[in-house]
Amino acid sequence: YAWAIMRIASGLCVAGCYTVIESWLQAKVTNETRGRAMGTYRFVDTFASLIAQLLIGILEPAQYVSYNLLALVCCATLLPITLTTIKQPETPVAPRLRPKLAIHRSPLAVAGVLVAAISGAAFRMVGPIFGAQVGLQVEQIAYFLSAFVFGGALAQYPVGWLADKYDRRWVLIWLSVAAIFSSISSISISSDGSLSIFILAFGFGFTTFPIYSVAAAHAHDFANSDERVELSASLLFFYALGAIAAPLFASSLIGFFGPNAMFIMIA
């Protein structure tokens, strides 16, 4: 129970950090540069999570030193915040969570955020089960998940550039189509010693990770200056809903229909 409580508390803190970061960032950029700004931000975020994932193979998760290192990293991140002289964005007098705000500003963005959450959470949480059922070894499962995150990190800025150059709605549509083809292609993969399973994981991450960035940029295109915090919180709320539901459905489908059911669900 103590572990569950701490996990809930850490989730609340992380959600708060993302809300502040994204609302501040969205308030400081223009519609012409919003996609690239979100792409750069998400590249740093995704690449850092990849490094953290790889550190699991170096550090012992159950050891005290691992948590000390994490605490030091969190403390170090406070330095640029405390030293900055940039004025914070405008906020409403009494900000609150308003999921309807995101729906009113851009229903497409809400749909995109849900798709990004479902695909990402299902792969990250249920991907190890999928890897084990198709015959991957423990270290291969780690590389399998890392290929997914690495593909997502590399896609962020190029897709952000496309979202600034072309209509963000069409970028979202083509990303979704590419994600569907990537999911369908992944159905036939098996651990036959080839690189195909890792290439497909890379491609799946490349097509699904940037959906959130483009969707968030599209929603903020229509937001007023005093709505940034509430809109960012609302988008993260929908992301959390998708991230909670996806692993539950994906794990159940895998149990009934086999490992390929995860990609069928995402498609």
For the regions a protein language model found, what residue spans apply to each?
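Cytoplasmic helix-loop-helix junction between adjacent transmembrane helices
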Residues: 10-43
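Intracellular juxtamembrane helix-capping segments at the cytosolic ends
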Residues: 16-29, 209-223
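Helix-to-loop junctions at the C-terminal end of transmembrane segments
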Residues: 60, 155-167, 254
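A membrane-interface helix-boundary motif in multi-pass transporters
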Residues: 58-73, 252-267
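Helix-loop boundary and gating motifs at the non-cytosolic
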Residues: 109-112, 121-130, 134, 141
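C-terminal membrane-cytosol helix-exit motif in multi-pass small-molecule transporters
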Residues: 71-91
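Loop-to-transmembrane helix entry/capping segments in MFS-fold secondary transporters
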Residues: 31-41, 138, 223-235
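Structural signature of the two symmetry-related core transmembrane helices
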Residues: 71, 170-185
